[in-house]
Amino acid sequence: YELTSMSPASKKPVMIFAFGGGFKGGDKADKGYIPYFEFLARNGFVVVSTDYRTTLKNLDPSKVSSPMDFIAALQHAIDTAVEDFYDATGFVINQSSDWNIDVEQIVASGSSAGAITVLQAEYDLCNGHELAKRLPAGFNYAGVISYAGAVSGVLPPHWEKMPCPIMLFHGDADKTVPFEQAAMENLGGLWGSSAVAKSLENLQAS
């Protein structure tokens, strides 16, 4: 999504979006997202709505008979989505000349499972996760916009280096993605927007 009336002389910022759907559904072309995309396009962004593998879609219930099994399946789903999001980011970077975009102004955004994906992508990037090696050395997003997101882990979020600016939107009564946390001791789980915000406050205070 972009405005054809934009000056071809100016490099454009990009927003890469990841859809929601519980890692078992969703659609990058969902009509519900189009007003958001068009708003950003009117404000000078190129918008790329990306796809990713939803590994919980065909999950065999017999393979998730315990909380540990479910957390492992969820972690695999998140890692897979992050891997695909990194690859989508790399694709956008590789197209930067043809699309006349500014690779230093790539913003990641997502909703629900997509928000988990983009937050986890930035979290893994800042913490030196192996998956982050799929991105060019020294790359970081210009910002993250999360709508009801979380990061996964055994412990509360801890950032090894300062992340990009992060904007969090999340209802505190959300029963799907936890606002606070949905983590089991020694097993891990999801740390919601409230926990992420606290970790960022602690990082700035240190």
Write out the residue ranges for each language-model feature.
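Short amphipathic alpha-helix adjacent to the substrate-entry channel of hydrolases
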Residues: 28-50, 57-59
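Primarily recognizes the serine-hydrolase "nucleophile elbow" in alpha/beta-hydrolase
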Residues: 87-162
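Alpha/beta-hydrolase active-site loop
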Residues: 65-98, 120
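Serine-hydrolase catalytic-loop signature spanning alpha/beta hydrolases and amidase-signature enzymes
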Residues: 22-27, 47, 91
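Short beta-strand element of the alpha/beta-hydrolase
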Residues: 10-22
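Hydrophobic beta-strand anchors of alpha/beta hydrolase catalytic cores
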Residues: 15-17, 47, 166
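The feature captures the conserved acid-bearing segment of alpha/beta-hydrolase catalytic domains
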Residues: 132-204
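Short beta-strand-to-loop junctions in surface cap/lid or active-site-entrance loops
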Residues: 1-11
